[in-house]
Amino acid sequence: MTKTVFVLNGPNLNLLGKREPGIYGVATLDDIEASCKREAGQLELQIDFRQSNHEGDLVSWIQEAGEKNAYVLINPAAYSHTSVAIHDAIRSARVTVVEVHLSNIHAREAFRHHSHVSAVAKGVICGFGAEGYLLGLRALAAIAKEEENNGQSIKGA
């Protein structure tokens, strides 16, 4: 059975490739989406790739993923550090989440060191640029395989 992964991207990620390439790299969000689609095909995953600058959209999509028993690979961007709403949506939806960041948030400004999402994520990948998305998909594929082998669903952290 093919598992669906919602790949959710938060604010300002639509500007990738133009916005601070020294921090976030030169890959655009379209480049990352194309790489994710290729990787997902090899991993026998289906992806639903989305981006919004609005917190409520991310909350609604997390809830939708929960209703569809899908996984979530999320780069909440700045909302990582501020959004209790996204934290609560993940907890309420009981969805398996991998959090990803292009930069190493722990090597940046102090206000970026804490993520509200990390506490409810299965795992966190940061600092590997666009490759982090592919690492996240591989992690979710491994979780899907484990669930299939065990005949159960592994939810949350």
UniProtKB/Swiss-Prot annotation:
The record marks 19 as: Transition state stabilizer. Keywords: Amino-acid biosynthesis, Aromatic amino acid biosynthesis, Lyase. It catalyses: 3-dehydroquinate = 3-dehydroshikimate + H2O. GO terms for molecular function: 3-dehydroquinate dehydratase activity. PROSITE patterns: DEHYDROQUINASE_II. The keyword Ligase does not apply. Disulfide bonds: none annotated. Its EC number is 4.2.1.10. The keyword Hydrolase does not apply. Homododecamer. It comes from the Bacteria. Catalyzes a trans-dehydration via an enolate intermediate. It comes from Brucella canis (strain ATCC 23365 / NCTC 10854 / RM-666). The active site is at 24 (proton acceptor), 101 (proton donor). This is 3-dehydroquinate dehydratase. InterPro entries: DHquinase_II (IPR001874), DHquinase_II_CS (IPR018509), DHquinase_II_sf (IPR036441). Belongs to the type-II 3-dehydroquinase family. Pathway: Metabolic intermediate biosynthesis; chorismate biosynthesis; chorismate from D-erythrose 4-phosphate and phosphoenolpyruvate: step 3/7.
